[in-house]
Amino acid sequence: MAIHKEVSFLAYLLVLGMLLFVSAMEHVDAKACTLECGNLGYGICPRSEGSPENPICTNCCAGYKGCNYYSANGTFICEGQSHPKNPKACPRNCDPHIAYSKCPRSGGKTLIYPTGCTTCCTGYTDCYYFGKDGKFVCEGESIEPKACTLECDSRLHT
C-alpha cells in the first residue's frame, strides 16, 4: 500500500512538473528577429517624466496615451490623449496642475535612433518606430532583446 502512495505521489509531481514546464515554454518566444534593412529612422518611447519638485510642461491633450499625469501632491489628473503614431493637434499651453507623468516604460530616452539589429520584432514594446520618411512603421514587439537573423523585415521597405 505504501508503494502505491509513493508511486501516486511521484506521478503527481511528474504531471505538475510537466504543466509548469509547458506553461513556462508558452512565454518563450522562439521566433528569431530579422536585421534592420536600413529604413527605421527613429522611435518614440513614452517615458515617465517630471516630479513634484521638477514639474513638466504639458497638458492632457498633448500627453502620451498610456501615460498617466499627476499633480505635485500625487492626485491623478488624466491619461494622455495623444498617440505617438497619430498625434492630436493640441494647444501647447502648460496645464499648471500637471507635475509629472507615469508611463509603462520608465527608463531611457523618449526619442531613440535605432541602429544595428533594430526591427519591429526587436524594438521594445510601448515604443513606436518610424521610417526615415517620418511615417509610422510599427510598434515594438520585444520585452527583452532577441536574436536576429540575416533576413530583412518585410515591414521595413528597402
Curated annotation (Swiss-Prot):
Family: Belongs to the protease inhibitor I20 (potato type II proteinase inhibitor) family.
InterPro entries in UniProt: Prot_inh_I20, Protease_inhibitor_I20
SUPFAM superfamilies: Plant proteinase inhibitors
Keyword Isomerase attached: no
Intrachain disulfide bonds: 33-121, 37-117, 45-127, 57-94, 60-78, 61-90, 67-103, 120-138
Residues with site note (Reactive bond for trypsin): 92-93
Residues marked Reactive bond for chymotrypsin (site): 35-36
Repeat listed as a keyword: yes
Positions annotated as Sequence repeat: 29-86, 87-146
Gene3D superfamilies, sorted: 3.30.60.30
Gene Ontology terms for molecular function: serine-type endopeptidase inhibitor activity
Organism the protein comes from: Solanum tuberosum (Potato)
Annotated signal peptide: 1-24
Keywords from the UniProt entry: Disulfide bond, Protease inhibitor, Repeat, Serine protease inhibitor, Signal
Protein name, as recorded: Proteinase inhibitor type-2
